[in-house]
Amino acid sequence: MCEGPSRISGPIPPDPTLCPDYYRRPASAQGRLEGNALKLDLLTSGRDLDSSPPRGPRIRPEAREILERGQRGVGDVLLQLGCISLGSGVSPKRKNPKDHEKENLRRIKEIQRRFQDQERSREQGQPKPLKALWRSPKYDNVESRVKARMKELGPTSVTEPAHFLRAHSRCGPGLPPSRASSPQLALPGPQAKGPGLGVDFISRNALAAKRAPRRHSRSLQVLAQVQEQQRQAQERYNATQKGHVPHYLLERRDLWRKEAEARQRSQPDPSMPPGHTLMPENQRLETLNNLLQSQSQLLRELVLLPAGADSLRAQGHRAELDRKLVQIEEAIKIFSRPKVFVKMDT
């Protein structure tokens, strides 16, 4: 027999079938936050569902913040204190960055619009009256000399042609006329009505413009002088240097030739036999000249011998002359060569 729920607390839970109304299965904290606290429990009965809906759990306002803090950890909270956020949400204290480019464009457009309005108002406005020039009061009662002269001359006839130059007609170079070429002006006679009357200034100006010497600017004169100097320098170069070998190249070529000859002389002749030396050229020519003189002398002696002499002495003398002539001829052949090698004394 059961008198109600047991008030004894121990490690062994009581049997829930005894008092099902008191031993309900509690919902989790996450389920209560998500709104699942009203789900059907296995131990609930149909009578309880039909009678009245169960009362919702009591949840504090900061429960969701505590749950999110537990899921993210404490590091995110510490970083949020330093204005650094690791989560997907944006900190409410941080403001959106200002777009300076759009702000500058907006200000530029405002300035342009303001200037356009000023230009439009200036164009539509009436012209401002000009300020009168200052005039000294001492000339108030003075009559104009031009007006007095016009009264003296009288009204000009309509049929009389006006002597003046039209636009772009007889335009000269604009240079002042030379004093030497300008014609002498005649003095006005007693019948002249006014100064300058009776002088044809148009003809005088045209004549002075034709006779005026043509003057060049300073830059053109300097340019002409420089071009003349360049032309003279080019002509001088063509006459003295163009097509000619420079002197330093000629000197260098002679030096190279002398060095080549010296190297050739210093090198041993490959045709020279061992133990011999080359006879100098002057000594060779001197020896050849002596041999030619000896040959001519022996030929003269051979010719002067008597033809009918058959003695042994005459025959021996003739044989000696022939032998010497043969030796001299052989020596002449040797010393007539360009190179003569002499055996060195050991």
Curated annotation (Swiss-Prot):
InterPro entries, sorted: Enkurin_dom, Enkurin_domain-protein
Domain (Enkurin) ranges: 251-343
What does the UniProt keyword field contain?
A: Cell projection, Cilium biogenesis/degradation, Cytoplasm, Cytoskeleton, Microtubule, Phosphoprotein
What does the record say about tissue specificity?
Widely expressed with highest levels in testis and lung.
User: What's the domain of life for this entry?
Assistant: Eukaryota
Per UniProt, the ranges with Basic and acidic residues bias are 98-107, 113-125
Q: What happens when the gene is disrupted?
A: Severely impaired epidermal barrier function with a significant reduction in the thickness of the granular and spinous layers of the epidermis. Misoriented division of basal keratinocytes and significantly reduced proliferation rate of basal keratinocytes and suprabasal cells. Ciliogenesis defects in multiple organs. Retinal photoreceptor cilia numbers are greatly decreased, leading to defective vision, and there is also a decreased number of renal primary cilia as well as a reduced percentage of ciliated cells in the tracheal epithelium. Impaired cardiac function.
Record's Gene Ontology CC terms?
Answer: 9+0 non-motile cilium; centriole; centrosome; ciliary basal body; ciliary base; cytoplasmic microtubule; plasma membrane; spindle pole
Assembly and interactions? Interacts with alpha-tubulin. Interacts (via central region) with CCP110 (via N-terminal region); competes with CEP97 for binding to CCP110.
Designated name of the protein: Enkurin domain-containing protein 1
**Origin organism of this chain?**
Mus musculus
